[in-house]
Structure formats: structure tokens, C-alpha cells
């Protein structure tokens, strides 16, 4: 089940405001989706995700297949029952994780043979197997199995011929994924994935073939895989707005706050990335005025919160009143610096709450600006603020 309602568009860009209706609820777009690799978003309670406005989260098909395994998940009726999340879930196909195994895997037309990174067992993932796993997970949005085209192969930029061969196999896998998805009578929604590397002609070919399959939604894959930023932005400017206008568009694995704003301007509706959670665990925080390295010595005695305009629990405490509005209930940079220096678990947890809140609030501001016809102004202000620096 999937219904996508296009609510408004921005006349000065390809940005759009929409509403996605799935089996487990509605999602207002544009949206950022926190990543819950092993069935949890690292370092944050599900209650906190609800409080900060998370509407949909991700699960990782590959890792959940390996642990806890399908028998366990089936016993709970799928991923929603297992992790006690009652809103929509999107699961990836497992293709990127298998691709990341490098020498431990062998890709053939039939699928991917690989050694389990957990116990070394020999395993096989095909489009059909991926659909079977994701049907057991009962995720609201299911991704086709694809081959992620790398930016470089053995230190050299992937050739157009190699990218074409990879893209065409992903198209064949898309058809096999669709056939198996339908055979299983899966009531959820299957997305296709546009590939083609950094070659716009291949992206266009992939896009046209997938659009002809009339899938419920489409993703742009194979970006943020080691290419220079200008190359990623070029593909981002080329592909999203060419996808069917009445279907949701998902940019996979991207990215920084600036990337999200630019993606929205190019017509993207959905984003996911591990950056807010991973960076939080490594002491890098996103703020209105740029990124903050909380481990730096200059924060040792700083009484300010991470972001004076932020209303997250970390910055504003239980009152939810931002520092700039007179609130003084949040945690200081000095305290967070201390937690990081001491290796206290609470440090990364509070940082994760802040980063995820920042991303989700950024998307909320974008939706509000689109509703008000003020996206161009918001885009300019966000760019200027972030460039200013903390």
C-alpha cells in the first residue's frame, strides 16, 4: 500500500511538498529517515525518536537477516513488532552491504555469493531472496536488490562500459524483484533504484526503464560512494526531477544538511544517512551556524548549549525552551565536552539526540517554508547561516 499526494511545488526550483500514506501511517515530505541498522537507531530511545518528530525509520535487511535471523523476526510478526515501532519502516535490499564486503563476495547474474561476516557461513542473496526477507520483515517500503556502481574500481574511475553493465544488471534485478514481490502478495510498496554511476546518459536509461515498470516509488542510488562532491551534486541536479512526478523520490545515503537542502531543491522527497548518528558518536555536532567539534579544548568551560536556537532535550532540557529564548535547562558545551573526554556513554547519547533533532527540524522548516511559498528565502538563509561558522 502506498499513496503519494503532491500538495505544493516551488515555482523557483524543483522542490515539492507531499504526503505519503503507508500501511503504518502517514509521512509528510520532504522527510529525513533515521537509520536503524540492527533494528535500533544507535544511541537513542524510540520514545525520543517519537518526541523529536521521526515519522519513518530504516532497517537494514542484510544485518537483520544475519542477526537475529528470519525465524526470530517472524515470531514477532515482523520488524515493527520486534523493535516496537508503530510508524512506517523502510528496509534496504542488502545490496550495498554485500557490495561493501569487497573480496568476500562474488557477484553473478543470479545474485551475490558471500561469506557471512558474523560466522563465515556461505550465503547467497538474490533479488528473490531479498524480497522474501523483506516480506518477512513486513517493512512499509521495500527496496529492489541492485548492484551499487562504485565511483572507482582498483583506483581508477569506473568506465562507462562497466557502469552500463552494472546498471543493466540492476534493471534485470529490478524486474526479478518486482516479479517475486508480486508472487509473494506483499501488501507493501516496492521501490526501484536508479543506477548508472556518474554517467548522465546511463542514469537517463535506467530511469526510463524503471519508470516503465510503474513501481510505487523510485530511489537514486550509487551516490555518496566516494565520488567528489561536485560529481554528486551534478547527478543530484540531473536525476531527481526527471523521475515520475506523481511518485515519491528517495535519495539514498545523503548527506550533510547542505546536501539535504540542495536535494529538496532538485525534487527529492526522502533522505536517509548515518551521518547525524555516526558524527554524534565521534563528537561532531550540527548546528545552525555550522559544525561543532565538542572534543575541542575551547569548549571546556563554555556554558552555552550546542545551538542556542535548538529546542531538543540536549540543548533545551525538559522545558523545551531554547537558550536564545531565555531557556537555561539544557546541557552546556562544557558538560558535553567533559562527558566526551571521560568516555561516558551519556555524551554520545545526548549528541545523537541533538543531531537527529537538528536534521528532523531542518526538514520541518523546509516543509513549512514550502507551505508558505518561502523556500527560496529559507534556502538562502540556511546557506548563509551554516557558512558563518560556530
Curated annotation (Swiss-Prot):
Q: Which residues bind substrate?
A: 92-96, 146, 195, 222
Q: In which pathway does it act?
A: tRNA modification; tRNA-queuosine biosynthesis
Instruction: Provide the catalytic activity annotation.
Output: 7-aminomethyl-7-carbaguanine + guanosine(34) in tRNA = 7-aminomethyl-7-carbaguanosine(34) in tRNA + guanine
- Details of cofactor binding: Binds 1 zinc ion per subunit.
Its family remark reads:
Belongs to the queuine tRNA-ribosyltransferase family.
NCBIfam families (UniProt xref):
Q_tRNA_tgt, tgt_general
Q: What is this protein called?
A: Queuine tRNA-ribosyltransferase
What gene does the UniProt entry assign to this protein? tgt
Amino acid at each position: 500500500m502506498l499513496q503519494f499526494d503532491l500538495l505544493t511545488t516551488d515555482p523557483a526550483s524543483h522542490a515539492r511538498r507531499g504526503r505519503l500514506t503507508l500501511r503504518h501511517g502517514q509521512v509528510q515530505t520532504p522527510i529525513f529517515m533515521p537509520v536503524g541498522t540492527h533494528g535500533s537507531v544507535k544511541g537513542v530511545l524510540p520514545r525520543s525518536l517519537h518526541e523529536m518528530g521521526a515519522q519513518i525509520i530504516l532497517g537494514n535487511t542484510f544485518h537483520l537477516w544475519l542477526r537475529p535471523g528470519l525465524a526470530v523476526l517472524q515470531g514477532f510478526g515482523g520488524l515493527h513488532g520486534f523493535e516496537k515501532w508503530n510508524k512506517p519502516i523502510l528496509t534496504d535490499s542488502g545490496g550495498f552491504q554485500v557490495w561493501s564486503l569487497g573480496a568476500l563476495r562474488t557477484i553473478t547474474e543470479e545474485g551475490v555469493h558471500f561469506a557471512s561476516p558474523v560466522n563465515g557461513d556461505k550465503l547467497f542473496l538474490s533479488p528473490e531472496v531479498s524480497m522474501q526477507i523483506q516480506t518477512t520483515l513486513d517493512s512499509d517500503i521495500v527496496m529492489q536488490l541492485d548492484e551499487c556502481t562504485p565511483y572507482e574500481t582498483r583506483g581508477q574511475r569506473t568506465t562507462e562500459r562497466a557502469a552500463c553493465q552494472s546498471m543493466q544488471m540492476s534493471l534485470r534485478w529490478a524486474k526479478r524483484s518486482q516479479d517475486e514481490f508480486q508472487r509473494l502478495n506483499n501488501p507493501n510498496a516496492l521501490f526501484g533504484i536508479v543506477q548508472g554511476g556518474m554517467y548522465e546518459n546511463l542514469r537517463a536509461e535506467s530511469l526510463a526503464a524503471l519508470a516503465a515498470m510503474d513501481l510505487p516509488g523510485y530511489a537514486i542510488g550509487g551516490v555518496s560512494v566516494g565520488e567528489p562532491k561536485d560529481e554528486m551534486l551534478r547527478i543530484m541536479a540531473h536525476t531527481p526531477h526527471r523521475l515520475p512526478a506523481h511518485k515519491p523520490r528517495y535519495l539514498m545515503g545523503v548527506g550533510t544538511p547542505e546536501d539535504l537542502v540542495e536535494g529538496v531543491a532538485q525534487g527529492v522527497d526522502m533522505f536517509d544517512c548515518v551521518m547525524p548518528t555516526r558524527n554524534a558518536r565521534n563528537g561532531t555536532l550540527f548546528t545552525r551556524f555550522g559544525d561543532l567539534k565538542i572534543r575541542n579544548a575551547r569548549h571546556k568551560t563554555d556554558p552555552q548549549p550546542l545551538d542556542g536556537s535548538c529546542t531538543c532535550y540536549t540543548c533545551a532540557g525538559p522545558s523545551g525552551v531554547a537558550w536564545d529564548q531565555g531557556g537555561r535547562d539544557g546541557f552546556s558545551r562544557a558538560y558535553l565536552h567533559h562527558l566526551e573526554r571521560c568516555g561516558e556513554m551519556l555524551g554520545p547519547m545526548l549528541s545523537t539526540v541533538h543531531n537527529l533533532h537538528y536534521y528532523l527540524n531542518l526538514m520541518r522548516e523546509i516543509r513549512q517554508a514550502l507551505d508558505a511559498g518561502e523556500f527560496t528565502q529559507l534556502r538562502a538563509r540556511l546557506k548563509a547561516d551554516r557558512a558563518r561558522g560556530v
